[in-house]
UniProtKB/Swiss-Prot annotation:
Tyrosine-protein phosphatase domain boundaries: 2-143
Family per record: Belongs to the protein-tyrosine phosphatase family. Non-receptor class dual specificity subfamily.
GO BP: negative regulation of MAPK cascade; signal transduction
The species this protein was found in: Dictyostelium discoideum (Social amoeba)
Active site, per annotation: C87 (phosphocysteine intermediate)
Catalytic reaction equation(s): O-phospho-L-tyrosyl-[protein] + H2O = L-tyrosyl-[protein] + phosphate; O-phospho-L-seryl-[protein] + H2O = L-seryl-[protein] + phosphate; O-phospho-L-threonyl-[protein] + H2O = L-threonyl-[protein] + phosphate
Protein name: Probable dual specificity protein phosphatase DDB_G0271350
Keywords recorded for this protein, A-Z: Hydrolase, Protein phosphatase
GO molecular function, one term: protein serine/threonine phosphatase activity
General function of this protein: Has a dual specificity toward Ser/Thr and Tyr-containing proteins.
SUPFAM superfamilies recorded: (Phosphotyrosine protein) phosphatases II
Enzyme class: hydrolase
Amino acid sequence: MGISMILDNFLYLGAAKDTKDEKEMEKLKITHIFSCAGTVHSPEKYIIANEKFEDDETVDISEQIEKAYWFIERVRMKKGARVFIHCMAGKSRSASIVLSYLLKRDIHSLSDCLFYLHSKRLEIRPNDGFMNQLCDLELKLTNKQTLSKEIKEWRSLQSKALKTKIDVQTCHFIQPSLDSTKKANEQYLLHIQSISFTFFEIHLNQDKIIQLYQQQCQLLHSNNIDIKYFTSILQEELSNSTKKAFDFLLIHYYLDWQDIINNLLNYTNLKLNLN
């Protein structure tokens, strides 16, 4: 079956074994991986969110849905970055995560998202428990449900998709619009800002930042510090200070030091002479 491109030159769906095909991964320019299965070949080549969970109807995937959404959005905000979502077979767990992203990203109906995903990867088959949760998510986001949980309406759609060749040309509506992209960008920046301020309060208060800045000024015999250089100093301080700081970033949807520091320098009122 191989790797399927879901959103043009950005979002891909497949199986764990696909990461072994290094030539294909390189050809597709994959930079990030969200793993639902915990198995990635050559992990040193990618930025990875490892969120293993079982393909079981009783498993609550709400946390994974939220983490995946912000992880994928973070990738989208990075120029040229591409993300691969996978589980063992690329049919249930990873398909559910991709469906949730499509649903949250542009607030399309779940039936439209499922139809679209089938057009890109015909063999997907999220289990009934995951589909129930996606129906609940759709209701929360749109105040309506387009697939009946009682009769498991997605099964008939899946059966129809397997019997009928879906015309991909009819499915372009799912590609993000400029307006929705602008809105998503604003939401992402607000998300980063909120988490960053919480992080500052716990791990890197303003007094500490000012102290580091003054120390660097003395070392460099200058009152003007390059912003990239000072960012590296802050990153080093964070990396050496506490494991809890690193854990915080993982818990809050795989942010990295650069996300935190850029937000710090953009949104705080620190009077630092950076260029």
